[in-house]
């Protein structure tokens, strides 16, 4: 279950980034994180920190809740 949550969260981050036509490289620079970190997030290999989520939501101009759409915890 935990891995599924990370995967879905990463997928949502990637979808929102692509909607804004921002490359991973540009996104990493904009949120002051490494390209490797962004890649791992989008693959569901790591979980974002609260600070990273905050930065991503500001850069993408969306509410943080958008990253959690479609994630079900049972």
Where are the model-predicted features located?
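Short, charged recognition helix plus adjacent turn
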Residues: 2-4, 66-74
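Short alpha-helical DNA-recognition segment
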Residues: 21-40
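DNA major-groove recognition helix of helix-turn-helix/homeodomain DNA-binding modules
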Residues: 51-66
């Amino acid at each position: 279950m935990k891995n599924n949550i990370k995967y879905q969260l990463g997928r949502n981050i990637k979808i929102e980034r692509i909607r804004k036509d921002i490359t991973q490289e540009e996104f990493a620079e904009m949120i002051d994180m490494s390209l490797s970190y962004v890649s791992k997030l989008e693959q569901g290999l790591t979980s974002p920190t609260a600070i990273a989520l905050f930065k991503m939501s500001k850069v993408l101009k969306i509410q943080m809740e958008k990253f959690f759409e479609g994630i079900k915890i049972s």
